[in-house]
Amino acid sequence: WLFDGLKANGGKWDVIGMSLYPQADTWQTMNTQCVANIQDMISRYGSEIMLCEVGMPWDDAESCKNFLSDLLAKTKDIDQCLGIFYWEPQAYSGWNAYTLGAFDNTGKPTVALDAFKE
């Protein structure tokens, strides 16, 4: 409804930014829904899309890697999808009560970020 209202009133934008923060038991469904939403936004508004914020709990790094690998694979062939940014990957467990980073308690990156190297 937001972009419909903006478009109807002559609003303009360069890129639509999206966020996605699934859990280990929801990422498959949420990735599918996110890709459908990306395709809908492109179709409806002709806009480029960027996943500006993604993340999962740091202590389930393997699930997070699977989530990211799947999402990267599903979006890489969508020309209008500009990319994916992990939000605050350097955050470690409990940093300012934020638990969705991709570093462990020793301050090292988890395997979650390996998805970006594939």
Where are the language model's segments positioned?
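Glycoside hydrolase catalytic-domain groove-lining segments
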Residues: 1-63, 73-77, 81
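Aromatic-rich peripheral "rim/lid" segments of glycoside hydrolase catalytic domains that contact
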Residues: 33, 40-46, 58-118
